[in-house]
Structure formats: structure tokens, C-alpha cells
């Protein structure tokens, strides 16, 4: 028997206990087989791939930032590829890009805004298209989109679209913008129950009944849709948080009484007079009423979360109802008959106050509003402005059209303030 010890770097079967070796061999072989199968699956088990970004760049696409369903920028996501087309992009270049995009392993966001693309047929093969922006294009026919069930966001702002029947099967759609189109019939939206944001500003829409069964709708914009008079269909949309009815023909918002989660309500330039319904909207943060017929704002007394209020060009004469709305940051009272602003003296969070062309003469109530950054007193009877000397946070003060005294002294006291006089 040799006295040489067995090599530790080249063990042979005699170095291992026989039972252990026999047990280990099947496990090792099995693990190797599993690993091989995984490698083969990754290599050949899927036809999806990453798009050729260099080729896409040569075709006229620029890499952009991915977005959320509401259009806001999303955090970086390796599973998303956002592409923005150069305005000079042609239809043939779009067609040439499709082979690089189809069957992608990433969701695609495509921005063709302000190009001359009219025919959408080449896009039919993009089964991972997540977002499509066609703003300012001559597109009018949407038939190519009817089977794009992965589409979550579609922007048709300033297109020639009038008929949206092709969208009726896109049940995954969460955000749809039809702003400034000739769309008038909304029947295609009846079953799009996943919609969160819908923009119908400056459209020909009149009948809102197709919207009454959209349970997840959070934002609805109807500003400038001048045919809208009846909003009864919105009464069941209890998920609504933001509603724009600016420049519509509505004269009553009684239908909104169940919408207790409302956070932003825009009612500018409407014939509306009665706003009692807002008493039941405790979460309201933004309320815009300029140019409406409102003359009584007592309904606002309990809106403790309100931070932006626009009452310009209304019929109000008293703001006593605002005295406990301490969350207010922006208040516009321009072109009203307001004379007394004592109700504002405890609104310590106020940052912007517009009193343009009001009847306010005494501004002593502003003395303690040290968070004020913008103050507009133009065309008012204000004369004594010494009270403003302590408002060192003021960035802008507008005094033209007044008989304000001691302006030079005020400028010396507020050297960082831009004073328009």
C-alpha cells in the first residue's frame, strides 16, 4: 500500500464513501437538466424581444419619458419604452418602424403628435401598445385601433376625429382625450368601465347618458362643450374627484349631491346661481366660479380643505363665509362689489389675493397675512398702504390705478418686492 495521500484537487471515487456518491449523482444530473431547460426556454421559448432603438432613432423617433395613465411622468421603468416622433416623420417611416416594435417584450408608448400621419393601419400589429398620442394630426379614421386591447391611454386632441365607434371594444382604456374634436356621440364609451380620465373639452357633446355607468371615472373635463345643459347622468359617478364644467350651459348642479369625494370643481362662465350642493363636498380643494351668476357663498362655510377659490366677476357683495377657511392659499375676488375684507384677517396661509377693480378701501385686515406673495390692488380706492410694510414675503404688488400714498417708503421697506405702480 502506498504511503502517498490522495490528491485533494483530483479526488476519485475511492476518496468518497460509496453511498454518498451514488445519492449525489442523480441530484446533480437533475439540476443540470433543469438549468439547461431554463436556458433553452429563455433563448427560444418566446419570440418577444427588445426593440432596436438605434434603428428607430434613424427612422425619426426620439426616446422619451414613460407616463402614467393621466399623462404625468412615470418613474423610470425598464418594462416601458416611450418614443416621440419628429414632426417630419412620414407614414412610410412609421411602417418601417413597426417590425422593430411588434412582439416587443416591453410596453410601447408612441407619441406621434404634430406629425402628418393620417393612416393608422401600420399600428395594427403593435399588440403591446400601451399609450398613443395623436395630438394635432389629420387622423380621422380610428378603425385600425379597434383590436388594440392593451391600449390604456389615447390622446386625440385637435384631430379630425368625429366618429369614435371603433373604440367601443377597448375595455382596458383608462385615459381618453377628445379635446377640441368634432365628436358629439359618446355611445362607444358605454362599456369602457375602466376609464379614469376623460377629456371632452370643446367638443360637440350634448348627451352625457353614456357616461352614467363609468364607476371608476375620477376626472371629467367638459369645459367649452357649450351644448351641455343637463348633467343628471353624472349623479352616480361617485368616484369623481375633478369636474370641469366651465363655459357650459348648466344652471344647476343639484345632480352632484352624492359626489362627496369631489376635490376640484370648475364652473366658470356658466349661468349657475345656486351652489348649495357643495355643502356636501367636504374634500373640495379647488372651486372656480368666475363669471357665474353666484351671489351667495354661505354654502362654503364648512369647506375647511379649500385652498383655491375663484370668485372673480360674480355677483357677491360679502365674503363673511370665508373667515374660517384657514386652508385658503389663493383667492380671486376681482371685478366684484366687495368692500369689506375683514373676514380674511385670520387666513394665515393665504399666498395670493386678487382684489382688482373691487370697492375695497381699507386693507388693515392684511397686516398679519405674512405668507402673502402676490397682492393685486389695481383700480381700487385704496390709499393707505403702510400696513403692507411688514409683508416681507411679498414678491409682487400691483397698485396701478390707485391713489396709494407713500409708495417710495413701501419700496424701501420691501426691497425684494416687484411693485407695479
Residue ranges with predicted function:
Residues 26-27, 39-48:
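Juxtamembrane cytosolic interface motif at the C-terminal end of transmembrane helices
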Residues 14-17, 48-49, 345:
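Polybasic, lysine/arginine-rich low-complexity segments
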Residues 4-21:
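Juxtamembrane low-complexity tails/linkers enriched in Ser/Thr-Pro and polybasic
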Residues 45-65:
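Ser/Thr/Pro/Gly-rich low-complexity linker/stalk segments immediately outside membranes or between
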Residues 19-35:
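N-terminal Sec-pathway targeting helices
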Residues 64-70, 78-96, 103-122, 128-144, ...:
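Concave beta-strand-loop units of leucine-rich repeat
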Amino acid at each position: 500500500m502506498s504511503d502517498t495521500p490522495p490528491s485533494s484537487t483530483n479526488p476519485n471515487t475511492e476518496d468518497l464513501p460509496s453511498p454518498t456518491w451514488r445519492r449525489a449523482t442523480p441530484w446533480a444530473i437533475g439540476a443540470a437538466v433543469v438549468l439547461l431547460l431554463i436556458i433553452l426556454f429563455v433563448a427560444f421559448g418566446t419570440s418577444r424581444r427588445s426593440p432596436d432603438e438605434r434603428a428607430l432613432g434613424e427612422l425619426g423617433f426620439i426616446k422619451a419619458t414613460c407616463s402614467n395613465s393621466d399623462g404625468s411622468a412615470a418613474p423610470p421603468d425598464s418594462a416601458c419604452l416611450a418614443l416621440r416622433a419628429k414632426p417630419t416623420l412620414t407614414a412610410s417611416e412609421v411602417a418601417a418602424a413597426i417590425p422593430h416594435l411588434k412582439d416587443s417584450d416591453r410596453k410601447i408608448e408612441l407619441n406621434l403628435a404634430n406629425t402628418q400621419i393620417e393612416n393608422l393601419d401600420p399600428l395594427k400589429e403593435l399588440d403591446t401598445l400601451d399609450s398613443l398620442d395623436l395630438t394635432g394630426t389629420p387622423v380621422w379614421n380610428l378603425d385600425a385601433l379597434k383590436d388594440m386591447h392593451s391600449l390604456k391611454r389615447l390622446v386625440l386632441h385637435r384631430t379630425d376625429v368625429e366618429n369614435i365607434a371603433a373604440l367601443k371594444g377597448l375595455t382596458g382604456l383608462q385615459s381618453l382625450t377628445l379635446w377640441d374634436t368634432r365628436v358629439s356621440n359618446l355611445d362607444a364609451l358605454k362599456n369602457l368601465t375602466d376609464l379614469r380620465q376623460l377629456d371632452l373639452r370643446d367638443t360637440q357633446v350634448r348627451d352625457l347618458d353614456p357616461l352614467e355607468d363609468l364607476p371608476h371615472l375620477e376626472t371629467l373635463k367638459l369645459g367649452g362643450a357649450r351644448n351641455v345643459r343637463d348633467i343628471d347622468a353624472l349623479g352616480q359617478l361617485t368616484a369623481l374627484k375633478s369636474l370641469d364644467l366651465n363655459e357650459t350651459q348648466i344652471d344647476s348642479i343639484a345632480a352632484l349631491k352624492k359626489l362627496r369625494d369631489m376635490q376640484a370643481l370648475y364652473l366658470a362662465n356658466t349661468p349657475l346661481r345656486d351652489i348649495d350642493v357643495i355643502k356636501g363636498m367636504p374634500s373640495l380643494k379647488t372651486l372656480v366660479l368666475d363669471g357665474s351668476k353666484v351671489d351667495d357663498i354661505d354654502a362654503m362655510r364648512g369647506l375647511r380643505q379649500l385652498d383655491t377659490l375663484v370668485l372673480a366677476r360674480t355677483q357677491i357683495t360679502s365674503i363673511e363665509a370665508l373667515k374660517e377657511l384657514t386652508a385658503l392659499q389663493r383667492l380671486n375676488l376681482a371685478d366684484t362689489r366687495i368692500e369689506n375684507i375683514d373676514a380674511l384677517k385670520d387666513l394665515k396661509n393665504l399666498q395670493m389675493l386678487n382684489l382688482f377693480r373691487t370697492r375695497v378701501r381699507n386693507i388693515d385686515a392684511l397686516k398679519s397675512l405674512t405668507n402673502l406673495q402676490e397682492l393685486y390692488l389695481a383700480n381700487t380706492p385704496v390709499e393707505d398702504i403702510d400696513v403692507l410694510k411688514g409683508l416681507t414675503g411679498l414678491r409682487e404688488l400691483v397698485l396701478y390705478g390707485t391713489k396709494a400714498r407713500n409708495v417710495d417708503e413701501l419700496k424701501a421697506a420691501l426691497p425684494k418686492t416687484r411693485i407695479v405702480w
